[in-house]
Amino acid sequence: MALSFSRDRSRALPLAAEIGALGVVFGDIGTSPLYALKQGVLAVGGTDFTSADVMGLLSLITWSIILSVTVKYVMLVLRADNDGEGGILALVTLLDLHRSAIGLRWYLLAAGLVGAAMLIGDGVLTPAMSVLSAIEGLQVISPALLDWIVPLTVLVLAAVFLSQRLGTERIASFYGPIMVLWFGSLAVLGVYGIMQAPEVLAGLDPRAGFHTVTTHPGLAGVIIGACFLAITGGEALYADLGHFGRKTIARAWLFVAMPALLLNYFGQGAILLRDPQAVRNPFYDLCPDLFDIPLLFLATAATVIASQSIITGVFSLAKQAIELGYLPPMRIRYTSEHNEQHIYVGRLNWLLMVACIAVVLGFEASDRLASAYGIAVAFAMVTTSILFVAQVNRAWKWPKPAVIALGIGLFSLDAAFASANLTKLHEGGWLPLTIAGIVIFVMVSWRRGLEGVVAQQQRFTEPLDEFVLRGDRASDAESPRTAIFLSRAGAMTPVALSRMADLLKVRFQRAVIVSVWIAARPRVSVDDRVRVTNLDGGFIRVDLRFGYMQQIDVPSVLGPALSARGVDPDEAIYVIGHERIIPPDEVVRGRDVVAHVFAFLARNAERSVDRFGLPRSRTVEIGYPVKL
């Protein structure tokens, strides 16, 4: 039986919703004070920095937060929701690309897939960077604890990933209050630091940032790339739009998260002005020694929450890609009876865990990991801007001058960050790009393979109407049962049905042809989910439509429609085709490589009986070869 989900974010009390948003949406960007300013100071020369350098870094961080997060995401991009959902793939589906010219369609689709792959690549680095930065506070408490940092980081990450299969619904209610305490601590510590050196507020002047960049022209890219670490969580605001809605996220950002972050950055800057040696860890040095241990535990909890949010986001992104046909089906388990966002993708979870732990063991310190961190998000932000400008132009019909001005503004900002992050390429930035490249290759291989399978099926099957007309003449016997055939061929005859008729010469008293379609929106209402067409000869065609965020349970949705037509759904059998992919014998072209990759993915993909929730005791699979 399908789970019944309710979406009640609009009914939630504003304060409760905003507290929840702090726990889910701002985990990544909220933990950036652990490392962002520190990396900026290291970029300008470690302990050999001037007060002007500190002011400049604070200026760059401040105006990056204002322009990229507040203006771009909160004021603009969050308005581009697809039935309440956000994220790069939601924006792709919102553009309704099938109505576009072929060249533009592929350009925008490629941008969306690249952005999605970049975010998945970032999902490997963000938990490692966040948790490692928090636990490095141990060396501030006692240098003797230095050797424990990496083992403890690995243990925390392993615990986070291993707990995913249990679901997070019960503990998620604590995320908001913990993050409220975290942001409150950021603000209090920031005010404490600013009071010791109020002259640090001169860093609000944007000219200070310009001065620092021009003073260190050879390090400009490195400096901007380091400051970009302060906004890497900005994309999460859009990705988590479906959890809380634009107004809730905007209020939580403008009145809680952003002020707390800015106060803390300036507090760290004040400490650096007083003591240049604080560059070893300005976040923890901002805190009085008495509170170091409580702050360490709070920071670790905050980074665990940030990691949890990233993992959940990757799961959600993968589900969207699966339902839209860009990733092979994987077993998705819903861990909540009330919230469809709470899912667990086992294979992906294990891959992420192994990759995250390998990253920690390989880099060992947040200073070295920072060289790899941020580049994937920078390019994801570029793709978001491309898709958003297309949405403004095509759907919102802004005047051309306004579209051009918006495009120039967004692309100038994103290009500065992306080009600055390219300076990290040889120091570790290749890692997230490599991960993203692998994801893109898998997406393209799966999509091309699916298209090849459908093309082969259409070559060797006939239109369903023609099959219905010749059905009686082609059969030697009739089964009194009702058979339900799942088809991905639309108006064509399912391969399983045609093979049963041609090879076994058997027809069923009633045959129900079911096609499952994924709509270009997150949810399809119950009234629009089922369309039934009665055909001749006891055939019934049923089209089921689901949103790309909905659980697909064919029996529960199909049952009422069959019962209304005198068919007992509990007595019917399901017949599904199972393709045995045969790739080329020799690999001589790029498409041959794609075919072999698709064959491997198909062998390891979730079977249709599990994906569609079919009863195993009443499901028959008919295998057939498909040569690519």
From Swiss-Prot:
Listed GO CC annotations: plasma membrane
The protein's role, per its UniProt record: Transport of potassium into the cell. Likely operates as a K(+):H(+) symporter.
The protein's name in its UniProt record: Probable potassium transport system protein Kup
Keyword Transmembrane in record: yes
InterPro entries (UniProt xref): K+_transporter (IPR003855), K_trans_C (IPR053952), K_trans_N (IPR053951), Kup (IPR023051)
Topology in membrane: Multi-pass membrane protein
TM spans (from-to): 12-32, 57-77, 106-126, 141-161, 174-194, 219-239, 253-273, 295-315, 343-363, 369-389, 402-422, 425-445
Species of the source: Azorhizobium caulinodans (strain ATCC 43989 / DSM 5975 / JCM 20966 / LMG 6465 / NBRC 14845 / NCIMB 13405 / ORS 571)
GO molecular function ontology, one term from the record: symporter activity
Keyword annotations of the record: Cell inner membrane, Cell membrane, Ion transport, Membrane, Potassium, Potassium transport, Symport, Transmembrane, Transmembrane helix, Transport
